[in-house]
């Protein structure tokens, strides 16, 4: 911690490395920021975190981004089970100054979370929760993560401070092919099934730019209603 450059830098041609069990950007207590310029920089295929909570990383308090996955050589990297922007008590008090995670410059097919135990908690960061930028950064999976209190959108496919708006037919290219978000058409609780909530939604997308079947995830929103704080379930 406290480096003027990157806390952990995995350079090109350094493969098979798993970064786990670290406090990156905080003091040893995990309660006080002692930020690096960037927390973690991956420039080759590697993984940050694990499904074992005992070896989770705390990546918080860094001046810029918490984790950066950069370049085509870093494609297929994974980020699992980390606390990014939280303190050691799990409170959102030590956000990184930029994005929680930035995927950029052609990094593709990366996996950010997935299923129980592999999800990341990403909160209180000065940018988006996960930002994907660069027109050739595609097919990155962002799944099951808890995001709240970030300054930018939970998932940002433009690298800009605003959400990527939906467009008709979704034929465009860009980060993750600028995938449209689902549109909620209705939600109702049937009188005869009061414990159930029936939801109707639509996703306007180009079959050439998406993998079918689409997996749609549902979350309980954070306090300002713009990010998914608690994963509820999936439909496909």
Label each PLM-derived region with a short phrase:
Residues 139-178:
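Conserved glycine-bearing catalytic or ligand-binding loops at nucleotide- and phosphate-handling centers
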Residues 17, 46, 77, 110, ...:
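Short beta-strand/loop motifs in extracellular/secreted proteins, especially
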Residues 6-13, 26, 30-45, 50-55, ...:
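Glycine-rich beta-solenoid repeat tracts in large extracellular/virion proteins
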Residues 215-219:
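Beta-strand signatures of extracellular beta-sandwich domains
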Residues 229-236:
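Solvent-exposed serine/threonine-rich low-complexity stretches and specific carbohydrate-binding patches
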Residues 165-209:
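Surface beta-strand/loop "capping" patches
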